[in-house]
């Protein structure tokens, strides 16, 4: 390896072949020699080639003398080239070679301290570069291992997540299937139970006999009471005359009391006549009492009622027979002023028996006038 002793020095120009140019280009490419000034001037330009070619033509024209000078010239050129090559290859850290026109080296110098320092620096740089390269090579497998471990951990986590998701999906599907199965089983059970109940109901309905038509039993009700059932019957003209005769007899006996009562009575305080009411005669004959005693039931019958009730009797109560000889006296009494002594109820009964309408709303004086006019 050739290093220049000083940055200011330059190699002399060499007029020869192009081999020196290749060496100069190689030296210029070294990183340690770039800051140093190294000038290798190659004068092998096309003009030199032209001069040589012109010389060759001259030698060819000149004859044998020129032929003799040509081998000597070639020998000198070859010697110069060999010396230059040997100098370059022999001295690595030596001083630069200076070539003169005679192509002879002037002197060889011993490598100095600066050159040694440069060589040591170059070695240190190489060692550092090698160490860095080794460190990078060592870091690469570590990083690859770490990445591989991370990738394996990530892949395991992904697998676990996928597995958990799959398990959840499977569990959800199983739950849904179980719910569907339970629903189906419940529905089938309900259908079976309903079908069984329907069959049982139909069988029971078939077994039950049809109910017979409702018939109300005949009632055996009989009313048993001590009071005779007497209903007011419409009084005919014949019956009315008989009743009036009985009333006249009673009126004659109770004349003084009736006159006092008639004076105190007012038409507004008269009670309305009830059609269902029965007037009981004050003086009854012995025959009437006998008939009433016959109609009344015994005490033994009322104390111990039988299982069957007696049907209500619709017979007309017996009326005492009055002689027709009293008709003349009745007519005379009706025509006279005795009507004013009668009560309002008695006057209304007389008006009813004679077929007068609206007697229930009439007052006592009106009834007396009507009856007196009709008489």
From Swiss-Prot:
SUPFAM superfamilies: Rho N-terminal domain-like. The keyword DNA-binding applies. It holds the Pfam family Rho_N. This is SAP-like protein BP-73. InterPro entries: Rho-like_N (IPR011112), Rho_N_sf (IPR036269). Residues 76-86, 295-311 have a biased composition (Acidic residues). Binds to the DNA in the promoter region of WAXY containing the sequence 5'-ACGCACGCTAACGTGA-3'. GO terms for molecular function: DNA binding. Keywords: DNA-binding, Growth regulation. Residues 59-70 have a biased composition (Basic residues). Expressed in tissues with high cell division activities: in root tips, stem node, panicle, flower and immature seed. Weakly expressed in root and leaf. The lineage of its organism: Eukaryota, Viridiplantae, Streptophyta, Embryophyta, Tracheophyta. Residues 338-375 are annotated as: Interaction with WAXY. May regulate cell proliferation and plant growth. It comes from Oryza sativa subsp. japonica (Rice). Residues 46-113, 130-233, 257-315 are annotated as: Disordered. One of its GO terms (biological process) is DNA-templated transcription termination. Residues 134-152, 163-186 have a biased composition (Basic and acidic residues). Residues 88-109, 187-197 have a biased composition (Polar residues).
């Amino acid at each position: 390896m050739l290093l220049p002793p000083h940055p200011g020095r330059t190699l002399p120009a060499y007029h020869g072949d192009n081999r020196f140019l290749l060496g100069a280009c190689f030296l210029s490419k070294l990183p340690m020699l770039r800051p140093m000034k190294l000038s290798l001037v190659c004068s092998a330009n096309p003009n030199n080639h032209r001069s040589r070619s012109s010389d060759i033509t001259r030698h060819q024209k000149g004859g044998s003398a020129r032929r003799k000078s040509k081998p000597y010239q070639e020998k000198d050129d070859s010697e110069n080239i060999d010396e230059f090559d040997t100098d370059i290859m022999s001295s690595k850290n030596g001083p630069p070679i200076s070539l003169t026109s005679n192509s002879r080296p002037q002197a060889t110098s011993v490598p100095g301290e600066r050159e040694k320092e440069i060589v040591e620096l170059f070695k240190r740089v190489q060692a550092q570069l090698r160490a860095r390269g080794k460190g990078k090579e060592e870091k690469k497998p570590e990083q690859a291992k770490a990445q591989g471990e991370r990738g394996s951990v990530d892949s395991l986590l992904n697998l676990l997540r996928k597995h958990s998701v799959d398990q959840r999906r499977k569990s959800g599907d199983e739950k849904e299937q179980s719910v569907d199965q339970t629903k189906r089983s419940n529905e089938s059970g309900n259908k079976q139970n309903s079908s069984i109940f329907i069959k049982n109901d139909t069988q029971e309905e078939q077994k039950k006999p049809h109910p017979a038509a409702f018939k109300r039993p005949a009632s055996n009700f009989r009313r048993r009471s001590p009071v005779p059932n007497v209903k007011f019957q419409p009084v005919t003209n014949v019956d009315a005359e008989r009743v009036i005769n009985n009333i006249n007899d009673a009126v004659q006996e109770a004349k003084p009391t009736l006159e006092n009562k008639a004076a105190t009575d007012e038409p507004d305080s008269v009670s309305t006549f009830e059609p269902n009411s029965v007037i009981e005669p004050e003086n009854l004959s012995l025959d009437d009492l006998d008939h009433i005693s016959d109609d009344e039931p015994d005490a033994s019958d009322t104390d111990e009622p039988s299982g069957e009730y007696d049907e209500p009797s619709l017979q007309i109560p017996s009326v005492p027979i009055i002689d027709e000889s009293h008709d003349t006296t009745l007519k005379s009494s009706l025509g006279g002023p005795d009507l004013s002594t009668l009560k309002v109820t008695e006057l209304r009964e007389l008006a009813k028996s004679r077929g007068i309408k609206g007697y229930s709303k009439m007052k006592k004086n009106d009834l007396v006038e009507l009856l007196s006019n009709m008489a």
